[in-house]
Every structure is written in C-alpha cells, then in structure tokens.
Amino acid sequence: MIVGIGIDIVELERIRSLLERSRKFPERILTPREKAQFGELPPARQAEFLAGRFAAKEAYAKALGTGIGRHLSFQDIEIVSDEHGKPSIAARRDGETVHLSISHSRDYAVAQVVIERLGPMTPADACHG
C-alpha cells in the first residue's frame, strides 16, 4: 500500500548561484559520504549532482509528510547508488519500501519518492487513505 508520495523540482541555475555565493552550501545538504562523491566530480557536474540530491531529499521529506525542518534535516537523509548507478534512500523505516527516481535536464533536476508499506492495511492506514 502506498503511504506517501513526494516530488520536488529544482532549477540548476539556482543551485549554481548558491554554490558561487557559498561553498558551504553542500555541507548543509550532503552527508559526509555524499560530499565525498560531490568532491570527486568535475565542477560542471557538481551543481547537477547537488540539485538532484536536494530534490530527492525534499521529495522524501514530503512523502513522509514532515518536510525538512525541526524533526528532519538534510543530514538525516542519505542518497546512495547501487553498482549500476540507481539511486535509493539509505535510511528506511521498518516494513516500508522507498522508491526513488531522479532526473535531470539542462535546466532542472526533479525527484519523485513513493513510500510503500508492505503487508496488510491497518485500521490506522484506512483513516489516512
């Protein structure tokens, strides 16, 4: 059963501008492992990577229903890639599967997250469905 859906779109130019103004911006968004990946990329690719991670984390927070804020930070969410480059959310709650898609164009990065709970629907789920 789907229990959350989130989507986010980011303008690459906005991320490029933030990177030019503050090299500390990636530290707010990326976990240490993500920052290591970011640092290995050529500068032209860094804004695209950061925009995709930003959009994915925002989409996940929206799917959870909390958004980024007091109870959930960018540092609480880590995007990892498998051996084929497919991204996924590293932290998961028990009994849930998280589906993540990140896409880029010349001007935008977009991410969509679907959170699926495995097993039968509970009475609490029925109230929210």
UniProtKB/Swiss-Prot annotation:
Cellular component aspect of the GO annotation: cytosol
EC number: 2.7.8.7
Family, per entry: Belongs to the P-Pant transferase superfamily. AcpS family.
PANTHER family the record matches: L-AMINOADIPATE-SEMIALDEHYDE DEHYDROGENASE-PHOSPHOPANTETHEINYL TRANSFERASE, PHOSPHOPANTETHEINE TRANSFERASE
Main location: cytoplasm
Subcellular location: Cytoplasm
Enzyme class: transferase
HAMAP family linked to this entry: AcpS
Cofactors named for this entry: Mg(2+)
GO molecular function: holo-[acyl-carrier-protein] synthase activity; magnesium ion binding
Catalytic activity: apo-[ACP] + CoA = holo-[ACP] + adenosine 3',5'-bisphosphate + H(+)
Entry keywords, A to Z: Cytoplasm, Fatty acid biosynthesis, Fatty acid metabolism, Lipid biosynthesis, Lipid metabolism, Magnesium, Metal-binding, Transferase
Superkingdom in the source lineage: Bacteria
Name of this protein: Holo-[acyl-carrier-protein] synthase
Pfam families reported for this sequence: ACPS
Source organism per UniProt: Geobacillus kaustophilus (strain HTA426)
One GO term of the biological process aspect: fatty acid biosynthetic process
Chain sites annotated for binding Mg(2+): 8, 58
UniProt keyword annotation of Cytoplasm present: yes
Functional description taken from the UniProt entry: Transfers the 4'-phosphopantetheine moiety from coenzyme A to a Ser of acyl-carrier-protein.
Keyword Transmembrane helix appears in the UniProt entry: no
